[in-house]
């Protein structure tokens, strides 16, 4: 085989990767253009919890001349990525799937769907539940001599980080179930360390949310529920000891058969 023939598969993979990246960027660009046409409406939706907490007649500000423009660009870009998500996953799947086994293909698709579901639930929880109470707490420091004047850039950065944080936190059941599937944790381990997990949840809620007991409880309770869901997932999909023993037995049988086959020719010669 010539050197050019050896390089051709690698070159083909690079060409396919380039084409799929180009299509992904085009999809994001189309989503960005569509989102930019509704930039003000999208920003109004994002700031709705804050405006509701501030009261009627209140407005946000921008402290630099290009701040509003760049804020709208960022909102449109984030929305464009969300709109292009189906295309991005499709291109990623079509590039990766040929190298996966059939069992792995069956496992990947449900994981992707569940990860998107949990992320959306977490972000929605932060937007609809935590944001209103958190903003009311922060705005409570206003007085006759102090007035809150949040800027567009500041709010976009804060809201984006918080929504991403809530989305990733709600991936907890999926992560622990995957770890149980790999044999890294067990149901007994999760049950035994439940009290430490609860302590971590309340500590994390105190750090992430405003120093308000109600808001901290509202953040910690869903995490406790997610932890219990993780235990159920680990029990159903976790790695079983019986399966490990069966796999070890099968491997030993295969090795025994192989050693028998290797010794048979020598016995025939004797």
UniProtKB/Swiss-Prot annotation:
What cellular component terms from Gene Ontology apply here?
TAT protein transport complex
The UniProt entry's GO biological process terms, in alphabetical order, are: intracellular protein transmembrane transport; protein transport by the Tat complex
Keyword set, alphabetical order = Cell inner membrane, Cell membrane, Membrane, Protein transport, Translocation, Transmembrane, Transmembrane helix, Transport
Q: Does the keyword Transmembrane helix apply?
A: yes
Q: Which domain of life is it from?
A: Bacteria
Job of this protein = Part of the twin-arginine translocation (Tat) system that transports large folded proteins containing a characteristic twin-arginine motif in their signal peptide across membranes. Together with TatB, TatC is part of a receptor directly interacting with Tat signal peptides.
The protein's name? Sec-independent protein translocase protein TatC
Q: Which organism is it from?
A: Desulforapulum autotrophicum (strain ATCC 43914 / DSM 3382 / VKM B-1955 / HRM2) (Desulfobacterium autotrophicum)
Gene assigned in the entry: tatC
């Amino acid at each position: 085989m010539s050197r050019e023939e050896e390089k051709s598969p690698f070159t083909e993979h690079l060409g396919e990767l380039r084409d799929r990246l180009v299509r992904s960027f085009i999809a994001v660009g189309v989503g960005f253009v569509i989102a930019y046409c509704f930039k003000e409406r999208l920003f109004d939706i994002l700031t709705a919890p804050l405006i509701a907490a501030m009261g009627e007649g209140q407005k946000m500000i921008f402290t630099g001349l290009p701040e509003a423009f760049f804020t709208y660009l960022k909102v449109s870009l984030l929305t464009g990525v969300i709109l292009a998500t189906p295309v991005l996953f499709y291109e990623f799947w079509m590039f990766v799937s040929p190298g996966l086994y059939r069992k792995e293909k069956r496992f990947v698709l449900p994981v992707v769907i569940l990860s998107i579901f949990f992320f959306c639930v977490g972000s929605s929880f932060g937007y609809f539940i935590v944001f209103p109470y958190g903003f009311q707490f922060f705005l409570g420091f206003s007085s006759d001599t102090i007035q809150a004047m949040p800027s567009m850039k500041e709010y976009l950065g804060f809201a984006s980080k918080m929504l991403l944080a809530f989305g990733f936190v709600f991936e907890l059941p999926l992560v622990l179930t995957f770890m149980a599937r790999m044999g890294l944790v067990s149901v007994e381990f999760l049950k035994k360390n439940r009290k430490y997990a609860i302590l971590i949840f309340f500590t994390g809620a105190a750090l992430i949310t405003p120093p308000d007991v109600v808001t901290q409880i509202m953040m910690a309770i869903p995490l406790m529920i997610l932890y219990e869901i993780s235990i159920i997932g680990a029990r159903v999909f976790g790695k079983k000891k019986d399966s490990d023993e069966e796999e070890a037995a099968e491997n030993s049988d295969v090795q025994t058969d192989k050693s028998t086959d290797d010794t048979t020719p020598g016995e025939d010669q004797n």
